[in-house]
Design a protein with these regions (language model features):
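Intrinsically disordered, low-complexity linkers and tails
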Residues: 2-37, 53-64, 70-73, 77
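Generic recognition of flexible, low-complexity loop/linker segments
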Residues: 28-30, 37-38, 67-68, 249-252, ...
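Short Cys/His-rich zinc-binding micro-motifs
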Residues: 30-46, 80-84
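Short Cys/His-based metal-binding microdomains
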Residues: 38-40, 46-55, 101-102
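An N-terminal structural lobe/cap that precedes and organizes the functional/catalytic core
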Residues: 53-153, 157-159
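Composition- and surface-driven signal marking solvent-exposed, interaction-prone regions
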Residues: 54, 161-162, 319-321
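Internal, well-ordered alpha/beta segment that forms a basic, Gly-enriched binding/recognition surface
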Residues: 112-217
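Charge-dense, low-complexity intrinsically disordered regions
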Residues: 221-409
Length: 409
């Protein structure tokens, strides 16, 4: 069977298999000559002789080289504010907390530490790609080099220095902080493209093909995600520039105490809480709707917020309506499962984690594993019904902001 893959996306033409490769459905290779000066079969747009010719004889990358590049990308510095704000950037780029340190992380910490997923290359290698909650100091948990000191202070002051009253501005800022981190992470993944491309050095041709095919599909998905993020950034920037937050939407769950699970992240939901598809993430020519989830503690009450902007109403209103249609006692377990299933920027109270049964911990780690695995197809497992009962602060009220869904507290 002959397979030819040609994709056009955002002006980039990718043709990794246009020349040289004929495949069976098991992806094994048939011999076919490729000229030394032809574009390489991997889609790099580099001549074959300077790319994959004799790739099997090249020295594999050293672990320390991979770790160095990984750390360089994940420690790069930028201010994520709108371009029109750049002239006001002041002070150093700081390691901004996506989950507030003093009010939130400290509230659930034990001896200054929380449990979280370490994202360094060394940690991933040590754990063989398996998710593992490890101790992280609250000075380092949830941080990224995404804002200068001035804009981090000024933009997020209504969250950091005021009690949470579920204003549209505060709900907007919850969504914006999660969005900024996701944009930073996706740009970082794009910057690691060269590193991924060299991962097949020293390997035989069949392994080279498998690695480059996976790379190609990953790159395609990541580029699509970046285009989505650019689309949404226009809306976030416009609200900040005009100081107009009327497009912010949110469903807020408040609690008597700090949530023992802290999260800050954004997703493009593909299923609602009944397991129904709500948007097709495989349609790369269509911009997808975006939803942010944040939990934190303002010193008086715990908050878990689902927030988005008006341009994502079509999907997000369906998703949240399906959650609010559940029995009230099911809200918390489903939300906990949703956080573990969809986000890696999750931080857990060590004491809470130890208080949960081994069965509960296994359920959540299974969902966590589904989240970070590239081998598991998208599914609604864990978000349609409670898989267990978890210890959690008392749910106080449910508040909707900016759109006409209502529920009784």
């Amino acid at each position: 069977m002959v397979a030819v893959v040609v994709f056009e996306f955002s002006g980039l033409r990718c043709q990794p298999l246009r020349r040289a490769l004929r495949l069976t459905k098991e992806f094994s290779l048939y011999d076919k000559k490729i000229g030394r000066n032809d574009p390489c079969w991997c889609g790099s747009q580099i001549k074959y002789k300077k790319c994959h010719l004799f790739r099997d004889k090249q020295e594999p990358m050293k672990h320390w080289e991979v770790n160095r590049e990984f750390n360089n990308v994940n420690s790069r510095k930028k201010c994520s504010c709108p371009d029109s704000f750049n002239e006001n950037c002041a002070g150093n780029i700081i390691r901004a907390h996506t989950v507030p340190k003093t009010s939130s992380l400290k509230a659930i910490s034990d001896a200054g530490h929380v449990l979280g997923l370490k994202m360094s290359y060394e940690a991933i290698r040590k754990n063989k790609g398996r998710p593992l909650l490890e101790k992280i100091g609250i000075n380092h948990a949830s941080t990224f080099n995404g804002f200068c000191k001035y804009h981090d202070d000024v933009i997020f002051a209504p969250l950091e220095k005021e009690s949470f009253v579920a204003s549209q501005k505060q709900c907007f800022l919850l969504a914006y902080r999660a969005f900024a981190r996701e944009y930073y992470a996706k740009e970082g993944a794009q910057d690691l493209s060269t590193l991924r491309h060299g991962a097949d050095k020293g390997k035989h041709i069949e392994a080279q093909f498998d690695i480059q095919m996976n790379n190609f599909l990953y790159e395609l998905g990541n580029r699509a995600a970046i285009e989505d993020l650019k689309h949404h950034k226009n809306y976030f920037d416009l609200s900040l520039e005009n100081d107009d937050f009327s497009t912010a939407r949110a469903v807020i769950f408040t609690f008597d105490e700090a949530p023992p699970v802290m999260v800050c992240g954004g997703i493009n939901p593909d299923f609602d809480f009944n397991g129904n598809p709500v948007q097709d993430l495989m349609d790369l020519l269509k911009r997808t709707d975006s939803l942010s989830v944040t939990s934190y503690y303002d010193g008086e009450k715990g908050v878990i917020a689902f927030s988005w902007l008006e341009n994502s109403d079509d999907t997000c209103c369906k998703v949240m309506a399906s959650l609010l249609d559940k029995d009230r006692e099911d809200y918390v377990p489903i939300i906990i499962q949703y956080m573990f299933k969809n986000f890696e920027n999750v931080f857990v109270s060590p004491k809470w984690w130890e208080s949960e049964s081994e069965g509960n911990r296994n359920i959540l780690m299974k969902l966590f594993g589904d989240n970070i695995s590239t081998d598991i197809s998208p599914n609604a497992n864990g978000i349609t019904k409670p898989l267990s009962v978890y210890n959690f602060p008392q749910l106080r009220e449910v508040i909707t902001v900016g759109y006409p869904l209502s529920t009784e507290p």
